[in-house]
From Swiss-Prot:
One of its GO terms (cellular component) is cytosol. The lineage of its organism: Bacteria, Pseudomonadati, Pseudomonadota, Gammaproteobacteria, Lysobacterales. This is Pantothenate synthetase. Homodimer. Belongs to the pantothenate synthetase family. It catalyses: (R)-pantoate + beta-alanine + ATP = (R)-pantothenate + AMP + diphosphate + H(+). It comes from Xylella fastidiosa (strain Temecula1 / ATCC 700964). The gene is panC. SUPFAM superfamilies: Nucleotidylyl transferase. It is found in: Cytoplasm. The active site is at H38 (proton donor). Its EC number is 6.3.2.1. It is an enzyme of class 6 (ligase). The reaction proceeds by a bi uni uni bi ping pong mechanism.
Length: 281
């Protein structure tokens, strides 16, 4: 049975006991409202560790002033049942006071330069600062051997890997594959904001990503591929923040040079719902 923990001292005691037994510990951080994508991360963690801690914390410092912190869906009972079903050992439920004992205004903040400034960083200033701040605290609380993050938030994964290297966290970072609906839409907690009319439209993002990948692999000019992706998404009713081709480290590829590995990334709004997705190749 899953152990739900709200006290940091108790959490540390549990993890310390696992350590004394020589067990390997994994952390799966989440903001709750869990779906099959999240549960796949827990199952991946179980392959790399003997015990799994999953945290649920809706982090106020990674939401912008006009974003959806207050209305972000919270489903604690369903989250607990789902985590127990996939073999999570501990559900860590810290309070805002536990995460930010000096308050969010006075807290020490972490900023990862360069990779935090582009794409999502341009459209959500301060977002990755909040992400890194809370993830570093979770690392210090749980002291995991391995931590698992979803590849749907690909830029977040790159940012966290850079933070782990730079701050010498002795933690292996794993990226879990995107889990999709039958029509290709990436599973997301924000999909439930979509209306019945918008839901079929949303799958156009994945189809556009496939077209971007195919065009690049056929020798298409990156700028032309990106422009066509924007046109296609706008024709489907989206307001596009970006539709880009990048190298795996998120650097821009040089036109005219064939890239052996890359990633197509899209962020776009359908009505009031902002969706992100990507496709590696």
């Amino acid at each position: 049975m899953i152990d739900t923990v709200t006290d940091l001292s108790r959490l540390r005691g549990i993890v310390a006991d696992w350590r004394r037994q020589g067990l390997r510990v994994a952390l799966v951080p989440t903001m709750g409202n869990l779906h099959a994508g999240h549960f796949s991360l827990v199952m991946l963690a179980r392959h790399y560790a003997d015990r799994v801690v999953s945290s649920v914390f809706v982090n106020p410092t990674q939401f912008g002033p006009h974003e959806d912190f207050q209305r972000y869906p919270r489903t604690p009972e369903a989250d607990m049942r789902g985590l127990e079903h996939v073999g999570c050992d501990v559900l860590w439920l810290p309070s805002v006071e536990t995460m930010y004992p000096l308050g969010t205004e006075r807290t020490v903040r972490l900023f990862i330069p360069c990779v935090s400034d582009v794409l999502e960083g341009t459209f959500r200033p301060g977002h990755f600062e909040g992400v890194c701040t809370v993830v570093a605290r979770l690392f210090n609380q749980v002291l995991p051997d391995v931590a698992v993050f979803g590849k749907k938030d690909y830029q977040q994964l790159v940012v966290i890997r850079q933070m782990v290297v730079d701050l010498a966290f002795p933690i292996e970072i794993l990226g879990g594959c995107i889990v999709r609906e039958s029509d290709g839409l990436a599973m997301s907690s924000r999909n439930q904001y979509l209306s019945m009319q918008q839901r079929p439209q949303a799958a156009e993002i994945h189809r556009t990503l496939i077209a971007m990948r195919d065009a690049v692999m056929s020798g298409g000019v990156h700028a032309d591929v990106e422009a066509e992706a924007v046109r296609r998404l706008e024709a489907a009713g989206f307001q596009v923040d970006y539709a880009v081709i990048r190298l795996p480290d998120l650097c821009e590829p040089i036109d005219g040079i064939v890239i052996s590995q890359g990633i197509a990334l899209v962020a776009a709004r359908l009505g009031n719902t902002r969706l992100i997705d990507n496709l590696e190749f």
